[in-house]
């Protein structure tokens, strides 16, 4: 009997966590706020793209985007950068914590007058990294 109650309580907790997460997302959309936190990857780019496109459909009022990221996948950051430039509403970007590497690409998508920084924000920009591997004959192709 105790095991059954415990399982039900765990299921209720998971259900409540999901409902709370949905409530928070709804509140963020109502206030036209997007948060980018952590590693930038394809999954994050898809999520942010959906949010920005949805906010554009909801109206032309400015969107506030908070960013705290040490970087990640360059092409994912390029996607977010391009969407910010593409949508009609003004996007105000606020840097907090670290804004580095691929995160800088996103931060720079806002017009200069729409970029803000909290007092303890640190920025880091570097040259793109890349390279080739393989047989010299294959690389020469």
Task: Give the positions of each predicted feature.
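Terminal-region recognition feature
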Residues: 1-141
